């Protein structure tokens, strides 16, 4: 909910304010069916290069873990596309944003060069949270407003 001033106008945002929120929830079996139907082409269409390497490594060790990995990354990309207000249309595409892990394991969004200029001109930081449990995978993305050049709201 946005606050409204007495004059009826929305007050200006301060740096670090939320510009967009995206969420995606999906059944993991949906990803299993897509993999069964399309094989590795499905993973190659969805995942960026680092994600794809991790997917193959996890799937070799445990096929179910590979599917869960793909499902969480699919959800993160959907959530990100919603947070930035584009959906899956240019300059956004599946492979132009990856969800990788920081040293401590925290998921981080890595925006590819083809999308970075567009994103950086409009937004500040992006944050992601992903989870999977039982038969579901989910992701939440929060995108911050771009701070003003002088740092003022």
From Swiss-Prot:
GO terms for molecular function: holo-[acyl-carrier-protein] synthase activity; magnesium ion binding. This is Holo-[acyl-carrier-protein] synthase. It is an enzyme of class 2 (transferase). Transfers the 4'-phosphopantetheine moiety from coenzyme A to a Ser of acyl-carrier-protein. Its cofactor is Mg(2+). It comes from Bordetella parapertussis (strain 12822 / ATCC BAA-587 / NCTC 13253). It is found in: Cytoplasm. Its EC number is 2.7.8.7. The keyword Lipid metabolism applies. Keywords: Cytoplasm, Fatty acid biosynthesis, Fatty acid metabolism, Lipid biosynthesis, Lipid metabolism, Magnesium, Metal-binding, Transferase. Mg(2+) binds at residues 24, 78.
């Amino acid at each position: 909910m946005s606050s409204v001033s007495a004059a009826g106008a929305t007050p200006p945002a301060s740096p670090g304010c939320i510009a967009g929120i995206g969420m995606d929830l999906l059944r993991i079996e949906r990803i299993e069916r897509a993999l069964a139907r399309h094989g590795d082409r499905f993973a190659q269409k969805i995942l960026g290069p680092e994600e794809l390497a991790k997917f193959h490594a996890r799937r070799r060790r445990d096929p179910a873990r590979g599917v869960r990995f793909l499902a969480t990354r699919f959800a993160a990309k959907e959530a990100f596309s919603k947070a930035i207000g584009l959906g899956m249309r240019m300059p956004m595409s599946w492979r132009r944003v990856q969800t990788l892990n920081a040293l401590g394991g925290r998921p981080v969004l890595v925006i590819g060069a083809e999308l970075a200029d567009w994103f950086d001109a409009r937004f500040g930081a992006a944050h992601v949270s992903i989870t999977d449990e039982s038969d579901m995978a989910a992701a939440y993305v929060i995108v911050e407003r771009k701070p003003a050049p002088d740092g003022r709201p």
